[in-house]
């Protein structure tokens, strides 16, 4: 059955119903065809048999093959040379780019050096500014006293305080014994109850600036209980106190003064003093905080300090410290709370490291009265508070009076604040008082205490002293302004240098992207050259095989040659006998005509356009018998021609039905809703007519239906028929023929063979064979056009085959509307003919294919009356019954056919009509137009059998044949109209393809990637689209047969893809960054890291962050998110000393649980087979899990049957570094036996080497572990 099916499906040259014409050439062709069907499939020469001797033809064929092999070798060597030149050119380009990058790097280094030098010049100015500001504050006084009164509550009675000025406060003592019961106090600043926290802080800010400049500053909140001390320091939720405002000011000033070489850092310590004992409020909850030592002369106390990087962290730490104090409010009144902000400044240029401290002190209540009912503990607490506050007053008094000995040791409070009270330190005391008359005595006591500290300051009542200090302050301000101006200029210069550095970095990024693009182009060209080289090698191999086949066939051809000669001799004799019979018949007919002419006086003309032999009038019995014989012979010959036409029409109908099937599927939803489509047009039996059909305007781009007949570099299926036709068309040489008649005969035979091959291929394979012989057919037609020897009707049929094949595969071409046939026909002297019912239908709105006006073809037919004798003869022959009918003669039909041919030459609109309308439908429309416009040719019930219907058929056939012949005629310097239409349709398809690629690339370029997987998908998708676009461009450049390229330039505009290329370069850079982040995350997947390792990982993440400017803005979030996640992961891993990590690494062994309980979820397994020389090879399946670990699946034991597979995570080769051989064997027990057999050796070193090679071999088969393999290497 298989042999029978192969015989039935074998391709052969037989055409059903086709018999060759009875001539010498056709006879030989028929005989050769008969031999070909019975014998094996042989390759025929395109040269006709009588043209050259057989031996000479075979020798020429062999020589031609040798020349082709030689040309193929030369092409191969040229391609190799081009590849070498391209490689050298790429290397030279890369060298130039590398040198240019070096120059840019040198410029960047110089800019960095210049920035450092500029900052080195700015640093002294900044220090001088700080010194001047500190001198200004010193000139105003190192110790300042502010007074603040809180608002009066409702139940506290009247107020006893007045505010006569900004520096004076007046207290009504209500002492009638005194002449002036009011007592005045002067301070540096006095704040009434209406003053808020912001106004108070505006005067405190210079002390904060001094602390940042390097001076120790202490701010003391002093006063009686419930006077507002704690509110001044802490504030409320909506009006913050000095704690939060001081740190925010420090943070903002540090940010504005920090540079690339200088940096500020802050840490916080919070403690309280109760009964002369220090209690750390931070170390109670966090034991791992770094400590700071406080030297208290007699002892050293360690306090915990926590680093804070922003105001939110500061408030959080401060809140946790306050929570540690507890809820004993009575205890708060006898406790001193101290919040110390430690300020660290470092400069890498000058090597300067500065430490300063800002102490914010909330002192205990100052009432100091001991009641009789107070307990012993409370009395002790009050005594300690009075002692510490008194000692603080003594220290301030000694400092302001200039004494040599300062009593710091009298209290733990003064010892703690010793470094912030004397020398160049700045001290601010804020006295908080209550305006109520109930607390008058405590208020006066607080004011006296504060006045004692302030009155020791040099008196401001001396005008000379005031003038002196004002002059000093004025000079200091002027100098400070000059320094600030110079500092501002230098900062502007630094900004300009940073901008220049940024421009240089941008140039580096652009150049880097260009280098990547050059690498990509070079890689693409190399891959293309490699593929072309492989194709040439395959072609060379095929040529060798064909050459060997031809040599084997030479012997068979020699045997067939003798047989063909004998057959030709027999055919020649038969032809001569037939020609003799025809001559006798013609002489008999001539005698009969002459005898009839003598009787009637007028000769009759023939009405057959295909036969040159006239028909005799039925006069005698002999002439009628001769006429019948001639008619039988002519009918046989015409039947053969009609069969070939019918086969061609069936082929055209199949192509049209296929294209209509595709378009009907697209149109099915819209046919019901369209009111302009008439049912008569939809239900016609033969496809669609030339009338306008509402097709969709745009195809579905997602389906990718835009294809050409041949797709560039796509491999086309080959068939024996296609190979034979390709060779015959390519090898056809007109120079080998003698005379134009021989050339025309050979060329037309080849075109007929093309049509016959497509017919035999059938509807399922007609597109394949058309694509296979496409280049050869178009080259053959282009080569033969200048000689004007081809049958233009055959050329038209071949062109229509290819255009309809293109229409069937291109939905956007099916939307083209063509003009109806009425636009191409008109009656003489009347302009346009009356339109048919189809043309005048109100629902029809045709859209013309061309914008220019279509000139119609004038059908010149006039009604004439015959003479009486002709009418009698016609009645005798039974041809006509009406003497008024039009006499359509052969001459008239030939003239009309010639005029139709001239009209069709170069007419692209008519070509579009032929392409989009089936031939049978088009001829039917022409017959209908003729019947409607020439009434004397109309068919009635009386003359159906008389032949009038035959006249309409003859006229429509003559017009159709003339148009078909004219459409295939070339118009120098252009090709024929159908060829021009094919070129234009191909350009439309290419334009749609390029725009489709542009739209897809634009959509992908605008899509934002969320993670590494989407980045990889986007990159591969953009690279795929770019590769397809380049393939389309290459196909356009090489497809000269369709596009008719001039001087190698592309006729299709190439849309700009700069944005898509930039996004692709950005995705490539982003992919590299994400791979490095993934590698860092993998290295950080441990429990403990060494300090050096952790520092190296963090530096690597910082370097990746610096590479982010090379990415587009759309890719920044993804990179920032991945880097931030990795940075947070590394930061959370505990660190140890390098020595501890090394000791642990020596003791580290892979646990059995880590091997058996690791993650074994693998998406895809890769199978490897190891042949060890035994009967059964080892089969191991390998894959990768989400942790980038190698996972294998194999039989637990080699000798066990299938089904006992186990899955294990394979440890890395580095695990075996410090293992002994026995320990390795124990580890391999948990792994499949095949792995241990392949890896174990006699020694430990040999086992490590074999295991490392085996691990690399397995990992190379897993795509996700290729980076791991490169790391191991």
Curated annotation (Swiss-Prot):
<dbReference type="GO" id="GO:0000911">
    <property type="term" value="P:cytokinesis by cell plate formation"/>
</dbReference>
<dbReference type="GO" id="GO:0008017">
    <property type="term" value="F:microtubule binding"/>
</dbReference>
<feature type="coiled-coil region">
    <location>
        <begin position="559"/>
        <end position="595"/>
    </location>
</feature>
<dbReference type="InterPro" id="IPR027640">
    <property type="entry name" value="Kinesin-like_fam"/>
</dbReference>
<dbReference type="GO" id="GO:0003777">
    <property type="term" value="F:microtubule motor activity"/>
</dbReference>
<comment type="similarity">
    <text>Belongs to the TRAFAC class myosin-kinesin ATPase superfamily. Kinesin family. KIN-14 subfamily.</text>
</comment>
<keyword id="KW-0547">Nucleotide-binding</keyword>
<dbReference type="InterPro" id="IPR001752">
    <property type="entry name" value="Kinesin_motor_dom"/>
</dbReference>
<dbReference type="GO" id="GO:0009904">
    <property type="term" value="P:chloroplast accumulation movement"/>
</dbReference>
<keyword id="KW-0597">Phosphoprotein</keyword>
<keyword id="KW-0158">Chromosome</keyword>
<feature type="region of interest" description="Disordered">
    <location>
        <begin position="827"/>
        <end position="847"/>
    </location>
</feature>
<dbReference type="GO" id="GO:0009941">
    <property type="term" value="C:chloroplast envelope"/>
</dbReference>
<keyword id="KW-0963">Cytoplasm</keyword>
<dbReference type="GO" id="GO:0005694">
    <property type="term" value="C:chromosome"/>
</dbReference>
<dbReference type="InterPro" id="IPR027417">
    <property type="entry name" value="P-loop_NTPase"/>
</dbReference>
<comment type="subunit">
    <text>Homodimer and heterodimer with KCA2. Interacts with CDKA-1. Interacts with AL1, a geminivirus (TGMV) protein essential for viral replication. Interacts with LUE1/KSS.</text>
</comment>
<feature type="binding site">
    <location>
        <begin position="223"/>
        <end position="230"/>
    </location>
    <ligand>
        <name>ATP</name>
    </ligand>
</feature>
<keyword id="KW-0493">Microtubule</keyword>
<feature type="coiled-coil region">
    <location>
        <begin position="627"/>
        <end position="657"/>
    </location>
</feature>
<keyword id="KW-1003">Cell membrane</keyword>
<dbReference type="GO" id="GO:0005874">
    <property type="term" value="C:microtubule"/>
</dbReference>
<dbReference type="Pfam" id="PF00225">
    <property type="entry name" value="Kinesin"/>
</dbReference>
<dbReference type="GO" id="GO:0005524">
    <property type="term" value="F:ATP binding"/>
</dbReference>
<keyword id="KW-0067">ATP-binding</keyword>
<comment type="function">
    <text>Kinesin-like protein required for chloroplast movements and anchor to the plasma membrane. Mediates chloroplast movement via chloroplast actin (cp-actin) filaments. Required for the chloroplast avoidance response under high intensity blue light. Mediates redundantly with CHUP1 the nuclear avoidance response under high intensity blue light. May act as a mitotic kinesin. Probably involved in division plane determination.</text>
</comment>
<keyword id="KW-0175">Coiled coil</keyword>
<dbReference type="GO" id="GO:0000913">
    <property type="term" value="P:preprophase band assembly"/>
</dbReference>
<keyword id="KW-0206">Cytoskeleton</keyword>
<dbReference type="GO" id="GO:0009903">
    <property type="term" value="P:chloroplast avoidance movement"/>
</dbReference>
<dbReference type="GO" id="GO:0009504">
    <property type="term" value="C:cell plate"/>
</dbReference>
<feature type="coiled-coil region">
    <location>
        <begin position="59"/>
        <end position="89"/>
    </location>
</feature>
<dbReference type="GO" id="GO:0031022">
    <property type="term" value="P:nuclear migration along microfilament"/>
</dbReference>
<dbReference type="GO" id="GO:0005634">
    <property type="term" value="C:nucleus"/>
</dbReference>
<keyword id="KW-0472">Membrane</keyword>
<protein>
    <recommendedName>
        <fullName>Kinesin-like protein KIN-14A</fullName>
    </recommendedName>
</protein>
<dbReference type="GO" id="GO:0005886">
    <property type="term" value="C:plasma membrane"/>
</dbReference>
<keyword id="KW-0505">Motor protein</keyword>
<keyword id="KW-0945">Host-virus interaction</keyword>
<dbReference type="GO" id="GO:0009524">
    <property type="term" value="C:phragmoplast"/>
</dbReference>
<dbReference type="InterPro" id="IPR036961">
    <property type="entry name" value="Kinesin_motor_dom_sf"/>
</dbReference>
<feature type="compositionally biased region" description="Low complexity">
    <location>
        <begin position="830"/>
        <end position="846"/>
    </location>
</feature>
């Amino acid at each position: 059955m298989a042999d029978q099916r192969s015989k039935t499906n074998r391709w052969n040259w037989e055409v059903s119903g086709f018999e060759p014409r009875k001539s010498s050439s056709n006879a030989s062709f028929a005989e050769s065809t008969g031999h070909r069907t019975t014998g094996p499939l042989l390759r025929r020469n395109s040269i006709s048999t009588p043209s050259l001797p057989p031996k000479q033809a075979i020798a020429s064929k062999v020589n031609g093959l040798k020349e082709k092999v030689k040309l193929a070798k030369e092409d191969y060597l040229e391609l190799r040379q081009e590849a070498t030149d391209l490689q050298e050119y790429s290397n030279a380009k890369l060298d130039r780019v590398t040198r240019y990058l070096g120059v840019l790097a040198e410029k960047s280094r110089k800019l960095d050096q210049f920035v450092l030098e500029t900052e080195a010049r700015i640093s002294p100015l900044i220090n001088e500014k700080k010194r001047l500001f500190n001198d200004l504050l010193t000139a105003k006084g190192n110790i300042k006293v502010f007074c603040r009164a809180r608002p009066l509550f409702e139940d506290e009675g009247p107020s006893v305080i007045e505010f006569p000025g900004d520096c004076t406060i007046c207290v009504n003592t209500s002492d009638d014994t005194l002449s002036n019961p009011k007592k005045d106090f002067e301070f540096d600043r006095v704040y009434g109850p209406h003053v808020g926290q912001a106004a108070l802080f505006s005067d405190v800010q210079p002390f904060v600036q001094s602390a940042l400049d390097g001076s120790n500053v202490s701010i003391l909140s002093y006063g009686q209980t419930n006077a507002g001390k704690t509110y001044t320091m802490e504030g409320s939720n909506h009006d913050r106190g000095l704690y939060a405002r001081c740190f925010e000011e420090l943070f903002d000033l540090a940010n504005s003064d920090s540079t690339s070489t200088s940096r500020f850092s802050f840490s916080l310590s919070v403690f309280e003093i109760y009964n002369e004992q220090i209690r750390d409020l931070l170390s109670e909850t966090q034991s791992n905080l770094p400590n700071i030592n406080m030297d208290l002369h007699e002892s050293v106390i360690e306090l915990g300090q926590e680093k804070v990087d922003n105001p939110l962290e500061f408030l959080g730490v401060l809140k946790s410290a306050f929570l540690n104090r507890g809820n004993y409010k009575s205890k708060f009144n006898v406790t001193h709370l101290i919040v110390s902000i430690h300020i660290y400044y470092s400069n890498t240029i000058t090597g300067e490291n500065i430490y300063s401290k800002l102490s914010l002190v909330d002192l205990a209540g100052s009432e100091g009265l001991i009641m009789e009912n107070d307990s012993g503990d409370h009395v002790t607490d009050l005594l300690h508070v009075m002692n510490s506050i008194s000692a603080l007053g003594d220290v301030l008094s000694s400092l302001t009076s200039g004494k040599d000995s300062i009593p710091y040791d009298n209290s733990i409070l003064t010892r703690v604040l010793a470094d912030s009270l004397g020398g160049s330190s700045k001290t601010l005391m804020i006295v908080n008082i209550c305006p109520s008359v109930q607390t008058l005595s405590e208020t006066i006591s607080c004011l006296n205490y504060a006045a004692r500290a302030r009155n020791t300051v040099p008196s401001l009542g001396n005008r000379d002293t005031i003038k002196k200090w004002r002059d000093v302050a004025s000079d200091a301000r002027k100098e400070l302004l000059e320094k600030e101006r110079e500092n501002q200029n230098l900062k502007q210069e630094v900004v300009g240098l940073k901008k220049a550095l940024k421009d240089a970095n941008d140039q580096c990024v652009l150049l880097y992207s260009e280098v990547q693009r050059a690498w990509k182009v070079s890689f693409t060209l190399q891959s293309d050259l490699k593929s072309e080289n492989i194709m040439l090698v395959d072609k060379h191999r095929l040529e060798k095989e064909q050459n060997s086949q031809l040599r084997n066939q030479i012997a068979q051809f020699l045997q067939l040659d003798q047989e063909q000669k004998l057959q030709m001799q027999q055919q020649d004799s038969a032809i001569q006998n037939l020609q003799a019979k025809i001559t006798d018949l013609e002489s008999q007919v001539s005698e009969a005509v002459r005898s009839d002419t003598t009787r009637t006086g007028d000769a009759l003309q023939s009405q057959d356009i295909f036969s040159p032999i006239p028909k005799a009038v039925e006069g005698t019995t002999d002439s009628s018998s001769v006429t019948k014989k001639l008619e039988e012979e002519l009918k046989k010959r015409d039947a053969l021609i009609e069969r070939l036409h019918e086969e061609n029409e069936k082929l055209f109908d199949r192509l049209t039905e296929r294209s209509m099937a595709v378009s009907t599927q697209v149109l099915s939803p819209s046919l019901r809703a369209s009111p302009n489509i008439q049912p008569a047009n939809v239900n016609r039996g033969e496809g669609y007519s030339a009338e306008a059909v509402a097709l969709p305007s745009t195809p579905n781009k997602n389906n990718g239906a835009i294809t050409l007949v041949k797709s560039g570099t796509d491999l086309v299926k080959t068939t024996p028929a296609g190979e034979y036709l390709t060779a015959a068309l390519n090898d056809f040489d007109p120079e080998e023929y003698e005379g134009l008649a021989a050339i025309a005969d050979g060329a037309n035979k080849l075109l007929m063979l093309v049509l016959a091959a497509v017919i035999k291929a059938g509807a399922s394979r007609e597109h394949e064979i058309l694509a296979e012989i496409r280049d050869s057919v178009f080259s053959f037609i282009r080569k033969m056009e200048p000689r004007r020897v081809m049958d233009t009707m055959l050329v038209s049929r071949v062109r229509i085959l290819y255009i309809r094949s293109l229409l069937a595969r291109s939905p956007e071409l099916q939307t083209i509307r063509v003009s109806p046939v009425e636009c191409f026909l008109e009656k003489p002297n009347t302009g346009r003919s009356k339109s048919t019912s189809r043309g005048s239908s109100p629902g029809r709105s045709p859209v013309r294919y061309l914008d220019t006006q279509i000139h119609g073809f004038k059908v010149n037919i006039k009604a004439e009356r015959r003479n009486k004798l002709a009418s009698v003869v016609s009645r005798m022959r039974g041809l006509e019954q009406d003497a008024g009918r039009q006499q359509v003669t052969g001459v008239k039909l030939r003239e009309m056919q010639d005029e139709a041919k001239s009209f069709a030459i170069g007419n692209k609109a008519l070509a579009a009509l032929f392409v989009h309308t089936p031939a049978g439908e088009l001829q039917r429309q022409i017959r209908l137009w003729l019947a409607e416009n020439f009434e004397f040719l109309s068919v009635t019930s009386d003359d159906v059998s008389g032949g009038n219907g035959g006249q309409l058929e003859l006229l429509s056939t003559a017009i159709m044949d003339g148009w078909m012949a004219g459409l295939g005629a070339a118009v120098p310097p252009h090709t024929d109209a159908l060829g021009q239409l094919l070129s234009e349709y191909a350009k439309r398809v290419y334009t749609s393809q390029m725009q489709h690629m542009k739209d897809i690339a634009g959509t992908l370029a605008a899509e934002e990637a969320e993670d590494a997987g989407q980045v990889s998908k986007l990159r591969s998708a953009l690279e795929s689209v770019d590769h397809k676009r380049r393939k389309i461009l290459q196909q356009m450049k090489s497809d000269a047969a369709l596009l008719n390229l001039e001087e190698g330039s592309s006729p299709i505009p190439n849309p700009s893809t700069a944005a898509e290329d930039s996004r692709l370069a950005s995705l490539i850079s982003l992919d590299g960054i994400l791979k490095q982040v993934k590698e860092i995350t993998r290295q950080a997947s441990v429990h403990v890291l060494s300090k050096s390792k952790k520092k190296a990982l963090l530096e690597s993440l910082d370097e990746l962050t610096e590479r982010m400017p090379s990415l587009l803005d759309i890719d920044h979030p993804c990179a920032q998110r991945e880097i931030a996640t990795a940075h947070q992961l590394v930061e959370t891993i505990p660190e140890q000393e390098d020595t501890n990590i090394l000791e642990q690494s020596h003791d580290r062994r892979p646990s059995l649980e880590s091997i058996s309980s690791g993650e074994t979820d693998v998406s895809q397994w890769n199978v490897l087979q190891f042949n060890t020389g035994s009967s059964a090879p080892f089969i191991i399946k390998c894959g990768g899990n989400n942790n980038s670990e190698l996972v294998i699946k194999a039989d637990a034991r080699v000798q066990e049957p299938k089904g006992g597979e186990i899955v294990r995570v394979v440890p890395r080769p580095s695990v075996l570094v410090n293992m002994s051989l026995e320990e390795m064997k124990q580890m391999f027990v948990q792994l499949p036996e095949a792995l241990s057999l392949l890896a174990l050796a006699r020694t430990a070193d040999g086992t490590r080497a074999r295991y490392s090679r085996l691990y690399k071999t397995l990992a190379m088969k897993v795509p996700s572990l290729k980076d791991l393999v490169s790391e191991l290497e």
